[in-house]
Amino acid sequence: MSYSIEILRAADKFLDKLSKQQTSDAEAIEEAIEGLGETPRPPGCKPLKGYSGIWRIRVGNYRVCYQVDESVLLVLVITVSTRDKVYDALRRHLGR
């Protein structure tokens, strides 16, 4: 069963910027996001405390935060950033 993947604008902008600076990191993140379409909760993913329904995967020094909507088989990538900035970005996007 495949899930559709939707990437919010801010996460997409981060990936575009990263692909110009560090191509291999951007490719690894994009591969990990594509993998979420087949396995939305891969080994090593973690639910985020204080954020109901939001999951996190690590890709090197980067974090991908996303939601899974089982009713429509959708993975929504909310934010992608470095470890030290991803949680601030997540709070901004969720208005917390």
Where are these regions (language model features)?
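Arg/Lys-rich, positively charged N-terminal/basic patches that mediate binding to nucleic acids
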Residues: 1-30
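Enriched for short, Lys/Arg-rich terminal
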Residues: 4, 23-24, 59, 67-96
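Residue-level recognition of oxygen-bearing side chains
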Residues: 10, 53, 85
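Residue-level recognition of specific faces of alpha-helices
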Residues: 14, 32-35, 47, 76-79, ...
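A generic structural signal for secondary-structure junctions
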Residues: 19-20, 34, 41, 91-95
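A short, surface-exposed loop/turn module that caps and links secondary-structure elements
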Residues: 31-57
